[in-house]
Amino acid sequence: MAGIKVFGHPASIATRRVLIALHEKNLDFELVHVELKDGEHKKEPFLSRNPFGQVPAFEDGDLKLFESRAITQYIAHRYENQGTNLLQTDSKNISQYAIMAIGMQVEDHQFDPVASKLAFEQIFKSIYGLTTDEAVVAEEEAKLAKVLDVYEARLKEFKYLAGETFTLTDLHHIPAIQYLLGTPTKKLFTERPRVNEWVAEITKRPASEKVQ
């Protein structure tokens, strides 16, 4: 049976999301490099793995998946008893799982669109020889501040976003945060005490440090 393969780019936020999950589980895998600058993700053979042309794609034996958050959920369930438990303490507790699911949805729809745009403006644009649009940065930082205010309130009640243990809800945030900590946007995290503590906790995890 073939092993685990991740088809993506090591600088991609979505690819990193999957890589961190694999490292948390201490799983062996192969990262198959997809060169985004050359548009390899928009043509075969990659399109046969993800018809929407976005990294990463994933294989575990005969199983083929795409969409990073679906992949991390598969990893968390399929390898629940290996490495770090990325689910709630009682993974069969539907109420606990629903809390974690809310957190994952908030990350996907409220945090990531803003954080990824800020990373693009302040980091990735320079890679492509483009200029940062400071007006866009200001607009997106205002949006991110509102999200982080919600997080600050939540983290005053719990150590992590879904409760007292580290879960996929927290993990999904890590790659974008890693990038933003290297930009002026870092201030939005550091000026909120509990968010700042949470960021330090999740970004210092050994699995997180392996993808920086």
Swiss-Prot record:
GO terms for cellular component: apoplast; chloroplast; chloroplast stroma; cytosol; endoplasmic reticulum; intracellular membrane-bounded organelle; plant-type vacuole; plasma membrane. Glutathione binds at residues 12-13, 41-42, 54-55, 67-68. InterPro entries: Glutathione-S-Trfase_C-like (IPR010987), Glutathione-S-Trfase_C_sf (IPR036282), Glutathione_S-Trfase_N (IPR004045), GST_C (IPR004046), GST_Phi_C (IPR034347), Thioredoxin-like_sf (IPR036249). Residues 93-212 form the GST C-terminal domain. Induction: By ethylene, auxin, glutathione, salicylic acid, copper, paraquat, acetochlor, metolachlor and the pathogens P.syringae and Hyaloperonospora parasitica. Pfam families: GST_C, GST_N. Coiled coil: none annotated. It catalyses: RX + glutathione = an S-substituted glutathione + a halide anion + H(+). Its main location: cytoplasm. It is an enzyme of class 2 (transferase). Residues 2-83 form the GST N-terminal domain. It comes from the Eukaryota. One of its GO terms (biological process) is auxin-activated signaling pathway. The keyword Endoplasmic reticulum applies. GO terms for molecular function: camalexin binding; glutathione binding; glutathione transferase activity; peroxidase activity; protein domain specific binding; quercitrin binding; salicylic acid binding. Expressed in the root-shoot transition zone and root tips. Belongs to the GST superfamily. Phi family. Binds auxin, endogenous flavonoids and the phytoalexin camalexin and may be involved in regulating the binding and transport of small bioactive natural products and defense-related compounds during plant stress. Binds a series of heterocyclic compounds, including lumichrome, harmane, norharmane and indole-3-aldehyde. In vitro, possesses glutathione S-transferase activity toward 1-chloro-2,4-dinitrobenzene (CDNB) and benzyl isothiocyanate (BITC). This is Glutathione S-transferase F2. It comes from Arabidopsis thaliana. The lineage of its organism: Eukaryota, Viridiplantae, Streptophyta, Embryophyta, Tracheophyta.
